[in-house]
Amino acid sequence: RICSVDEKNEILYVPAVSICRLIDNKGNLKAKYAEMVLHQMWCVANLRIRSVEVQGDSAAIRFHQPESRIQFEHPWPRPMVTTNGHNSAFYLTNARELQDVPGEWYHDIDARKVYYYPREGEKMQEAEVIVPAVETLVRVEGTLDRPACHIRFEKITFSYTTWMRPSEKGHVPLQAGMYLTDGYRLDPK
């Protein structure tokens, strides 16, 4: 769980032990595409990690833009820090250094390789591997004058799409999976 939040400087503090696999012996971030998945009340944010600074038993995590600004500007849902230990939960992802459980995989964008930790008894020579490359399979568009209506899909299966936005621009949601493209305040400065 997170330890504290510094909204002004756009920093989340987490236990240092939770990020030890992402930093080298000098404290530098070695997993340049690492992400934090942050549970905050009724939605989950995906935040690309820009830097980590260990400070004793905690670590200050800063995030890439635009999601850092959006995350710390919008009024809710906020990362929770409570007096009874029910702070927002998080986990780290998108780093080869985090692979420690069979079935996990990591896509190294720079090397153009996928690293996979096989499950017991799994033979990669016999595995069916599918790499989704398309985000949109069907697009239905309309206007007020020409609305899209009376559309039905029957006996069709849509499979194997991808959604790369969180890894490319972060994902700061509001509600029902809707993501914010900009921050806002209830009391503008």
Residue ranges, per PLM feature:
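Extracellular polysaccharide-degrading/modifying enzymes targeting complex plant/algal/animal polysaccharides
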Residues: 1-189
